[in-house]
Amino acid sequence: YLALEKSVTICTFGDLVRVPGSKKSLADARSEGGKIHIVYSPADAEKYAKEHPEEEVVFLSVGFETTTPAGCLSVKKAKEEGITNYSMLIANKTMPQAYEALKGSADIFLYPGHVNAITGTKLCEELVQEGVSGVVAGFTAKELLTALAVALTHFQKGKPFFVNCYPRVVTEEGSKEAQRLVDTLMEACDSEWRGLGIIPGSGLRLRDEWGMYDARKK
């Protein structure tokens, strides 16, 4: 819709181009004349907007706590540089509420290390009090197998547990700098998850004072 009917330049990661939309994919829109520009980061999208002031540029912001700070940085930089033709269409989500929604559906959560590197482990530790068990895992084969072995060993004891199996990257506090940046620019909102429906407070949107960079408000 934005690319074809509003003549907006869409900046997006390459893996989103062929994802089916409600009516068509970005690849379909591009074949019909829509301007779809592949970027590798939100910073690339902000730079493109700066270099093409005659175009209205919208970055498709997706992902979880790991990718959200980079989007916030691009908005902060755009404001500092006085760029007004840049905004984000935000579909970022946060994991804590998803854990709460799914806590009765699994024996053990294998928590993603890259997310916990940002959020820390406090929530995971708190979920143990609600009977939710889990381990934080890294991404190499050895790290994943270690996390699975630890999880199974603890599970056999029959008590809720939490173990951080990725301590070289994940700490209890997480990245305070990234957390502060996101909290400054964004606030929680309800969000729809495919297959799960609406999960209250699991989405993010720009705060009112940053609304000029929210494509939905533009």
Enumerate the predicted regions with their spans.
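Metallocofactor- and cofactor-centric catalytic cores in central/energy metabolism, strongly enriched
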Residues: 1-54, 68, 75-81, 89, ...
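Predominant activation on well-ordered alpha-helical scaffold segments within soluble catalytic domains
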Residues: 1-4, 46-47, 68-76, 96-100, ...
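Short glycine-rich or small-residue beta-strand-to-loop segments that form or flank ligand, phosphate
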Residues: 9-14, 56-62, 109-111, 135-137
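Short, ordered loop/turn segments at secondary-structure junctions
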Residues: 15-17, 41, 64, 93-94, ...
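A generic structural motif
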Residues: 39-40, 86-93, 135-139, 165-167
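Phosphate/pyrophosphate-binding betaalpha-module
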Residues: 60, 64-122
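A conserved active-site cap/scaffold subdomain adjacent to cofactor or substrate pockets
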Residues: 103-167
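Internal helical hairpin/lid segments
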Residues: 145-218
